[in-house]
């Protein structure tokens, strides 16, 4: 077994990472194929309509973005040749680079970019702030467009370059004109891979082939930026819901890659010289519990605060991960050891206080109505391994609890429902947020508090939205820190989201996959497969 890691414990810092990207500069042999088991099966083809990471990963296979972030955190052009900023800091002019082609042969144009940004910005929480600040978006010519804002801001660069959900993927204009409420079904991008629709079996199999017409950038690959050079002919994603089946398959050479290896089975992989383990904190993240603010009983703030008081992060993380070197408790909404990491307002977040939970429920007049928790049994890190612990902690805190078991895709669909429980609604769901998605009040979509326009759960706090917009229009470090701290205090008081700790992902790959890219997303460009 070969292990690649920049640290031995999470205490070294969850901000430093060696992500699970795959890369190499060697040439691929004919008809090479990587067979991969991703964190969850691919069922949807719309990376704008949901924050589910497997669909984000799919997006990076076939689409491209205007901007990217390199391994040092710097914003770099990707589809762009350049951008320019007006003297007053309000207008950004973007120019596309040469050689951008859709998979069906057409040229990528500024009209495609404008339509794609518009659809994405209605869904993405940072995009929503950007849209509120935008006064004009103008097509200048087929390769050039501009965005003008009501005040000086760098939110366009930040929003269009952010690597994780929702990434601002550029689509053909005809596709991007689809209502955000209607999932797209086409799979035509301009990225380094093409999607083979004829092979697609939702939840079972997805096939990508090298896009021979793709023109990569000339700069070396770095993080999500630089050249996206495909060195294999095909990548196939397959579903293996049983963890032991996946481990046996990679040991036997039947598959090449597991995005998230099961922690309890790592000893079986560590002892195999044909397997490399890749420890990633940037692709790991923060498990969260999300409460439905629209439906009883969590439409009552006291009941939400009771739920927070009942939670014990240590018990939950132990159930989820097990090995303490891969997790830690953390009371920071924006991540521990990050620029805006703080425990301000966290109160009872880390340790349970069942007596306080019961007292709050009594004060709220809670009548014992069952709280319905959705349990994604096929996705450990999103709750499959720890929802039973949450249920027990809530019961100890005085709640009546009903656990509804389901697969991850069913949860992703059901969590969009704002209906009462009797009509298929819900009270609690769990998932995890990548550290790339939680670093500040703009990136952290769970902090958004614009009611029914917010992420699933729909908290509403006008002051939080005011602070988030202020965060987008200042560059004073002290002011930014003060804004982030106040956002955390307000969100935690309102129980907009309940962070449950932090963990590192451990991925597994055959030793024949050479080269590792530092990236917050598992990528398949720049990879060399040298054998079985």
Residue ranges and their predicted role:
Residues 193, 324-363, 378-386:
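Structural transition elements
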Residues 164-236, 244-245, 355, 359:
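Gly/Pro-rich hinge or "lid" segments in bacterial periplasmic/extracellular proteins
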Residues 200, 507-532:
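Long beta-strand-rich cores associated with HINT superfamily self-processing modules
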Residues 202-204, 243, 261, 327, ...:
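Ligand/substrate-recognition segments at binding pockets and active sites
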Residues 37-87, 115-118, 188, 499:
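N-terminal lobe/hinge region of extracytoplasmic solute-binding protein
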Residues 29, 95, 129-201:
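Surface-exposed binding/hinge segments that line
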Residues 348-350, 402-413, 417, 442-511, ...:
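Extracytoplasmic/peripheral linker and loop segments enriched in polar/acidic and small residues
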Residues 294, 298-338, 382-386, 491-499:
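Periplasmic-binding protein-like
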């Amino acid at each position: 077994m070969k292990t690649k890691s920049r640290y031995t414990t999470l205490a070294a810092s969850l901000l430093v990472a060696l992500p699970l990207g795959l890369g190499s500069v060697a040439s691929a042999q004919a008809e090479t194929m990587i067979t991969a088991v991703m964190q969850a099966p691919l069922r949807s083809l719309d990376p704008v309509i949901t924050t589910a990471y497997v669909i984000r990963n799919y997006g990076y296979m076939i689409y491209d973005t205007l901007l990217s972030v390199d391994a040092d955190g710097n914003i770099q052009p990707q589809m762009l040749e350049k951008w320019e900023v007006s003297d007053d800091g309000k207008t950004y002019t973007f120019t596309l680079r040469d050689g951008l082609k859709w998979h069906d042969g057409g040229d990528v144009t500024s009209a495609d970019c404008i339509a794609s940004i518009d659809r994405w910005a209605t869904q993405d929480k940072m995009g929503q702030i950007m849209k509120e600040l935008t006064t004009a978006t103008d097509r200048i010519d087929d390769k050039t467009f501009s965005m003008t804002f009501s005040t000086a801001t760098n939110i366009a660069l930040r929003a269009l370059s952010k690597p994780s959900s929702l990434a601002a993927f550029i689509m053909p204009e005809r596709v991007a004109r689809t209502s955000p409420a209607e999932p797209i079904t086409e799979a035509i991008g301009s990225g380094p891979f093409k999607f083979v629709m004829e092979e697609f079996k939702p939840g079972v199999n997805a096939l990508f082939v090298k896009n021979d017409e793709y023109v990569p950038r000339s700069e070396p690959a770095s993080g999500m930026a630089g050249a996206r050079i495909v060195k294999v002919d095909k990548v196939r994603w397959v579903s293996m819901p049983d963890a032991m089946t996946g481990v046996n398959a990679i040991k036997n050479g039947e598959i090449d890659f597991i995005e998230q290896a099961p922690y309890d089975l790592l000893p079986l992989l560590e002892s195999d010289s044909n397997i490399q383990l890749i420890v990633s904190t940037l692709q790991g993240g923060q498990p969260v519990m999300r409460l439905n603010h629209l439906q009883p009983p969590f439409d009552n703030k006291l009941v939400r605060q009771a739920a927070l008081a009942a939670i014990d992060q240590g018990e939950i993380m132990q159930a989820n991960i097990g090995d303490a070197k891969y997790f830690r408790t953390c009371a920071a909404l924006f991540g521990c050891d990050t620029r805006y990491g703080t425990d301000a307002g966290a109160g009872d977040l880390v340790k349970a206080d069942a007596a306080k939970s019961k007292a709050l429920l009594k004060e709220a007049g809670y009548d014992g109505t069952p709280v319905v928790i959705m349990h994604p049994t096929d996705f450990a890190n999103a709750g499959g391994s720890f929802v039973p612990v949450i249920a027990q902690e809530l019961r100890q805190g005085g709640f009546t609890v009903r656990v509804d078991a389901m697969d991850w895709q069913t949860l992703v669909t059901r969590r969009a429902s704002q209906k009462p429980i009797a009509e298929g609604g819900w009270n609690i769901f769990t998932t995890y947020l990548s550290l790339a998605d939680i670093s500040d009040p703009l990136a952290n979509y769970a902090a958004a508090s614009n009611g029914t326009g917010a992420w699933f759960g729909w908290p509403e706090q006008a002051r939080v939205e005011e602070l988030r917009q202020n965060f987008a229009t200042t560059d004073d470090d002290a002011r930014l820190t003060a804004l982030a701290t106040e956002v955390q205090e307000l969100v935690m008081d309102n129980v907009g989201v309940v962070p449950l700790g932090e963990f590192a992902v451990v991925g597994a790959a055959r030793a024949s996959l050479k080269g590792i890219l530092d990236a917050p997303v598992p990528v398949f460009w720049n990879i060399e497969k040298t054998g079985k």
